[in-house]
């Protein structure tokens, strides 16, 4: 939802790897000049609220923080109700295909994460031509268990489908082999995304 919402208003979406530790999150938030941060409070063993509350006071550019499962997220929805459709159309009409729309960061395994700034044209063309290469149509149902913070899920998955009218099937919040295979069977998927380790886990 936020991928499409930020694109519609011309905000730059900064993808954050949920496996980042506090120091990596701090670096990405500061280096990108992030003004707003939306996060889950926790997932499995990761305590995102604690990480964000440690980082936020140190970042001058960060104007507001919201968590999906508390009143701060409700405040976002309330603020959205104050924006008219006409205002949204005017904002969208002023955008250019060359505008920066997304910053994707590396994993940071060999140092601090490195950010790549991408435009509307960059990511939409990438997704479109992936869909063309795979001959996607409105009849296709694509299972996307790969992460959305990376190009594979966000661009080759979401935008390849969107640009061809194909159905996106999202089996679980993070990769779960059994849930993925169940989704493929139940939704009659025509494509399944993944990397070798994921396919090995699914075959096990």
For each predicted feature, which ranges?
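A short helix-loop-beta submotif of the ANL/AMP-binding
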Residues: 1-14, 18, 22, 31-36, ...
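Conserved S/T- and glycine-rich ATP-binding loop of Class I adenylate-forming
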Residues: 6, 37, 100, 106-109, ...
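ATP-dependent adenylate-forming carboxylate-activation enzymes
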Residues: 11-29, 41-51, 166-187
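Conserved AMP-binding
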Residues: 17-19, 136, 146-150
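Adenylate-forming
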Residues: 39-53, 146, 189-204
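ANL superfamily adenylate-forming
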Residues: 43-97
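Conserved pre-ATP/AMP-binding loop-to-beta segment of ANL
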Residues: 67, 81-105, 112, 117, ...
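Conserved AMP-binding/adenylation subdomain of ANL enzymes
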Residues: 124-141, 151-191, 200
